[in-house]
Amino acid sequence: MLRTTGIYFIILVMILVKCFLPDEKPEIIPFPLQSVSDKGDFTFNKATLISVENEKQAMIARELTDLFTLSAGFTPEIKIQDKRANIIFRTDRELAAEHYKLNIAPSCILIKASGQKGFFYAMQTLRFLLPPAINNQTQVENIQWNVPGMTILDGPRYSNRTVAIHTPFTLISKDNLKELIDHLAMLKINRLHFTQEVHDTTPEGQQKMKDMNLYAKSKKITISNGTTHTHDIISYLPFQAERLIWKANISDCDEDKKGYSNI
């Protein structure tokens, strides 16, 4: 009798602890302003249908569905104003610019925002909530493409969220730089600065360049990868714009000087 009572007591304590523990935080960077976990998961599959209000929203939704094409081997369909959809884009003018509300239930996902930026950032949050394999460039087998049930209300804490890249010392290829821009968009970065100053006229600057060349040689990396040319950097701008990462004014520099500043 005492043993049975002890077991019941342990079960009761476990239930109480579970009730009073805070909700597990979603693995989203940056962490949302508000998030409340709910029961159940929403599963993406071949039958998933996304309803949007216009073509601009469709372009944003396509950023996500293209990931499924590569990694999952299926592409969720996108239609305008389709009542059968289980993922719904809905404009809410009461939400501030760049803010969004995401309601995830087992049967549907409702995405609210006042404009393009909010819907785009909601897509980035969904990308975080999906299994990491969603970012694979080749198809992955035996994956349940689930996102946990929850309600998220989110928006930026800062209007300018900037990353600066010092191109003379950036030892990555142009393709890798585009991949970096894509990941910056996931983090909801909205400005990218390319700096062009090369401090090789001082002894310290010359030593730095020498060390960089030695390091690059040891890693079989070519420093003069072309990322510092004005025309190359300009070629990234449409790619950045699709991911809502903006620039400042291009300085009036000629290509021979590899000049590009104030971005």
Segments and roles (model prediction):
Residues 2, 6-156, 249, 254, ...:
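Acidic, contiguous N-terminal accessory segments
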Residues 95-263:
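Feature activates predominantly on carbohydrate-active enzymes
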